[in-house]
Amino acid sequence: MGQKIHPVGFRLPVTRNWSSRWYASNRNFATMLAEDLKVREYLKAKLKSAAVSRILIERPAKNARITIYSARPGVVIGKKGEDIENLKAELTRRLGVPVAVNIEEVRKPEIDAQLIADSITQQLEKRIMFRRAMKRAMQNAMRLGAQGIKIMSAGRLNGIEIARTEWYREGRVPLHTLRADIDYGFSEAKTTYGIIGVKVWVYRGDRLANGEAPVIKTDEREDDRRNRRGPRSDRPAGDRRPPSRDGARPGPRGPRADAGAAAPTDKPADGAAPAAADGPKAAVKRVRKAVAPGDAKGE
């Protein structure tokens, strides 16, 4: 059921890491988790135009460090850093501890699953055909190095009466392989017909257990075309006989049946010299006697 489980949670112990990294006792765990959820909702609404990919929250002792991964870091920072200072003040007020905000730039937004999903939902809200938006995003991702991508849209697509689900895939998207680097993103488009959900899976190659070093794979398509029957035995080119049950070829080929049989001939007359063994045989002409008319009718 690899297509049902969340790709990030499925790979957390293997190749992925948590987006909230802190430790809390049982008494404070629920409170801190609720604070994280509210901070994420606030940042996504505040930085909607900044193309935010993901948010990492870390809490050292009596401090907080928030890292924002964005494809447009200039929008987050603002003119002369005014916006980011206001953002720090608001986050400090919400969390109640000093907050440090770091901005990381996303180099290739075309192969980031969350940014792809957000881009498609923005196009759907502008009444662009969903098939055109999905196929354009897939082409851009494959062109910039993704090994596979799958996009699924669900809802009242194009304003139809009955909701349906459509998905397209290009390349490989191995959902069951734990070492596969699968990036997953989800977004919702709020249209006049209702909400349309968009899910994106991007396959960016395999990773080792630590999640850092990629695995270099060779092209195995040529190896798959090898002869599955195994090596052929040493035999003449004209030998096409099938092997026996034990796998061995039968013995040497005997003479052909029609080669050793001689054509039927009449015995030579007495005193006639026999034909040479190697010479051509004399042709025998057979003549059918004509029957007299009286003999045919009977006397």
From Swiss-Prot:
Binds the lower part of the 30S subunit head. Binds mRNA in the 70S ribosome, positioning it for translation. Residues 214-299 are annotated as: Disordered. PANTHER family: 30S/40S RIBOSOMAL PROTEIN S3, SMALL RIBOSOMAL SUBUNIT PROTEIN US3C. GO terms for biological process: translation. This is Small ribosomal subunit protein uS3. Residues 217-248 have a biased composition (Basic and acidic residues). HAMAP family: Ribosomal_uS3_B (MF_01309_B). Belongs to the universal ribosomal protein uS3 family.
